[in-house]
Amino acid sequence: MAEPLYTRDILKLATSIPFEERLEIADGRAEKRAPICGSQMACDVCLDDNQHITEIGLDISACALGQASAALMGQDIIGRSLPELKETLRQLKAYLAGEIEDVTSWPSLMALSAARPHKGRHGAICLPFETVIAAFEAAMVAKTEALPA
């Protein structure tokens, strides 16, 4: 028998998203939408001089899987770099597609394994990482533009 999609653990995660408040001052901001399911997320980030996340603010309107993914991301996001986030998104997409068996860069994402056969939910699961990457990239552009000529 197939594992239920909305497990007790996923539902618990969906109600425990950290950093669920936008930042007043941020280095970068982004808003993204998952086209298939309509989930939406806004993200604000602050970076240190070494280009690692020091603060994050989230506003998410998504299904329980998207919220659970945001919660798992939020648990371990502080101190992460852009290459780490991009590698995690790459692994997450490959894991959901059945191409790899685990997400070594962010092991807690394995809690979303019940969603692997549900391709229509993959966009909501990837949305938190796509949005934080976009906010990070916006911060990098803003910092570059702020450099003296």
Question: PLM features: residue spans?
Answer:
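Short, thiol/selenol-centered motifs that function as redox-active sites or metal-ligating centers
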Residues: 61-67
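C-terminal binding/interaction regions
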Residues: 1-21, 30, 80-149
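Structured beta-strand/loop patches that form or line metal/cofactor-binding pockets in enzymes
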Residues: 16-60
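Short, surface-exposed, polar/charged, turn-prone segments marking secondary-structure boundaries
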Residues: 41-42, 51-52, 74, 84-87, ...
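Alpha-helical support elements that line or immediately flank enzyme active sites
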Residues: 69-81
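Secondary-structure capping and boundary motifs in well-ordered enzyme cores
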Residues: 37, 65, 117-121
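Generic ordered-secondary-structure signal
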Residues: 8, 26, 43-44, 57-59, ...
